Design a protein with these regions (language model features):
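A short alpha-helical element within helix-turn-helix/winged-helix DNA-binding domains
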Residues: 63-73
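A short, conserved structural fragment
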Residues: 88-99
Length: 144
């Protein structure tokens, strides 16, 4: 019998060519695209503006409410919530006491934490795959 587990997380990592030159705004957009929440159809670049606003609030040591983000970014609270949910699903931001903030103290720390999440998920998958190998008596061999 197959159990229907609640989804604990979902990761979307897009492998994009690294930008040739250093540019703060382009680098922030690149990270947003790599995590799949900067959509090409988002002509107003709302997601990027939200992410940049959250980065600035992290620099100041604060989080922001959805209402504060809506005011700073200049879009509806509904649009803010839509993009925040995508960013939370990507693992980059969290909500604490009603305030949204980067998951780590910096973009790099946030990416490190997401990487550790991915490793934990892959280890669980590998463990089950190993059980299947054992059950089916399938050999595991390193690539030569």
């Amino acid at each position: 019998m197959v159990s229907r587990d609640k989804e604990l997380g979902r990761f979307l990592i897009i492998d994009l060519r690294r930008l040739p030159t250093k540019n703060l705004n382009e680098d922030i957009d690149w990270i947003a695209r790599c995590f799949g929440f900067l959509e090409t159809r988002d002509g107003a670049q709302t997601a990027a503006r939200i992410f940049k606003t959250l980065l600035n609030s992290t620099k100041e040591g604060d989080g922001l409410t959805s209402d504060e983000l809506a005011e700073k970014v200049g879009v509806t609270r509904g649009a803010i919530i839509h993009h925040l949910n995508k960013m939370m699903n990507s693992g980059l931001i969290i909500i604490q006491s009603g305030q949204y903030k980067l998951r780590g103290r910096s973009p790099r720390r946030t990416v490190v934490e997401v990487r550790l999440d991915l490793i934990r998920v892959l280890e669980k998958i590998e463990d089950i795959a190993s059980c299947i190998d054992d059950e089916l008596n399938l050999p595991y061999r390193e690539t030569q």
